[in-house]
Amino acid sequence: MMRILLFLATNMAVMLVLGIILSVTGIAGNSTGGILIMALLFGFAGSLISLFLSKTMALRSVDGEVITQPRNQTERWLIDTVSRQAQKAGIPMPDVAIYHSPDVNAFATGATKSNSLVAVSTGLLNNMTEAEAEAVLAHEISHISNGDMVTMALLQGVLNTFVIFLSRVIATAVASSRNNNGEETRSSGIYFLVSMVLEMLFGVLASIIAMWFSRYREFRADAGSASLVGKEKMIMALQRLQQLHEPQNLEGSLNAFMINGKRSELFMSHPPLEKRIEALRNL
């Protein structure tokens, strides 16, 4: 969950800055071809910057410490387990980090398979058995072997491009119609306002698509974990999460806005735990 939020937040920040630059400067403002070219350049800039900064940002956000030399049995077990799973998955050994948090959590990130990171919280190590933690680590290794961060970056780049392109094409049409009515002094202000509003609206739709893909890749990572360590261990890990985290915080916050049931899943980066368990049992 955290790695997705970090990625999307960075991407959104870059998109907002670039969008303001585009609107204020009027770059490619009247040319559909020019808008498309700039949308492609700026659209992928946000996602690629997020991708290449993901490892550094994730570590800093949790104040994680990469294990360079194991200092105790737990760190040795982590290194040995990740090394064994990475070898089985056919990927280079990722960096392994621990961060202090009561939350039961782990994440994988990094721009490439050869420059990746797996991090686990002390809460996970303290609340899960070795078998359960092993399954969680295998889940994160599967994210790396599947190239999920790169795929997410490419998808986000495409979505960014459409958001920028459509918002500015529509804004240009609205501003131009005002110009035809003789209100030329308002065109730049209207263009900026319309493009920003549409960018936010289309951005929400793009986020829904990105969250759908995130849920899809979680199912794939669960299946990857089952392949590496066996589905029973992954099921046990998910059942442990059910005991520790239900009701889910995200669902609770969405319920406060009267978004319930299947509609709430639109905004979730992970599928409901019961669906993940059911999918594993059906493997």
Swiss-Prot record:
E.C. numbers: 3.4.24.-
One Gene Ontology MF term: metalloendopeptidase activity
Note accompanying the cofactor annotation: Binds 1 zinc ion per subunit.
GO cellular component: plasma membrane
Cofactor or coenzyme needed: Zn(2+)
Residue numbers binding Zn(2+): 139, 143, 218
Cited PROSITE patterns: ZINC_PROTEASE (PS00142)
Alphabetized UniProt keyword annotations: Cell inner membrane, Cell membrane, Hydrolase, Membrane, Metal-binding, Metalloprotease, Protease, Stress response, Transmembrane, Transmembrane helix, Zinc
Active-site residues (renumbered): 140
Coarse class of the protein's main subcellular location: membrane
Compartments, as annotated in UniProt: Cell inner membrane
Membrane topology: Multi-pass membrane protein
Entry's transmembrane regions: 4-24, 33-53, 147-167, 190-210
GO biological process assignments: proteolysis
Family statement: Belongs to the peptidase M48B family.
PANTHER family hit by this protein: PROTEASE HTPX
Protein name listed in UniProt: Protease HtpX
Species per Swiss-Prot/TrEMBL record: Haemophilus influenzae (strain PittGG)
